[in-house]
Amino acid sequence: MSWLPKSPKARRRLMLVAAIAPVLAVAAGLTLWGLSDSISFFYTPSQAEAARPAPGRSIQLGGLVAAGSVVKHPDGRVEFTVADQDAEDRVLFQGDLPDLFREGQGVVAIGAFREDGVFEAKRVLAKHDERYMPREVSKALKEQGEWYGDGQRPEHQGDAL
């Protein structure tokens, strides 16, 4: 046992560390495992298309509500399209939309993709004043050249939005 320290005090410390380390590792693992259900990643439609999150996995989908895409059903279901410059995703939501929800505005839908590729939202968040847009949405739109921060979008020829 040449790898053990010769000092009895150092041996006790080593044994204490050897006993505590696995307990701490198990505690950290259980904590991370417990939090895994509450972690929700943010995706724009083009990022979701590239990443293909597993059906049923909770995510946040953010972008602009496409013009002419909102369909309200008599049973309270609402269908709309969340789009960015490169992709769009169909969203289904059961319930009341925020008062400020409208076409052409930033939105974050929290939910999961179904097997058929439709996003089923459990919650929908909309911007709350003229200059506000959720940080994740504005950052993603800036990276794609679609958001300019002043509320004005330049004219795009052939732009589907």
From Swiss-Prot:
Stated role: Heme chaperone required for the biogenesis of c-type cytochromes. Transiently binds heme delivered by CcmC and transfers the heme to apo-cytochromes in a process facilitated by CcmF and CcmH.
Organism, scientific name: Phenylobacterium zucineum (strain HLK1)
GO biological process: cytochrome complex assembly
Name the record gives this protein: Cytochrome c-type biogenesis protein CcmE
InterPro entries: CcmE, CcmE-like_sf, NA-bd_OB-fold
Annotated TM spans: 14-34
Regions of this protein lying in the Periplasmic compartment: 35-161
Main subcellular localisation: membrane
Gene3D superfamilies: Nucleic acid-binding proteins (2.40.50.140)
Subcellular location: Cell inner membrane
Membrane-side (Cytoplasmic) residue stretches: 1-13
Keyword DNA-binding set for record: no
UniProt keyword annotations, A-Z: Cell inner membrane, Cell membrane, Cytochrome c-type biogenesis, Heme, Iron, Membrane, Metal-binding, Signal-anchor, Transmembrane, Transmembrane helix
Disulfide bond in keyword set: no
A Pfam family assignment: CcmE
GO cellular component terms listed in the entry, alphabetical order: plasma membrane
Gene: ccmE
GO molecular function: heme binding; metal ion binding
Superkingdom of the organism of origin: Bacteria
Residues reported in the UniProt entry to bind heme: 128, 132
Annotated family: Belongs to the CcmE/CycJ family.
Membrane topology term: Single-pass type II membrane protein
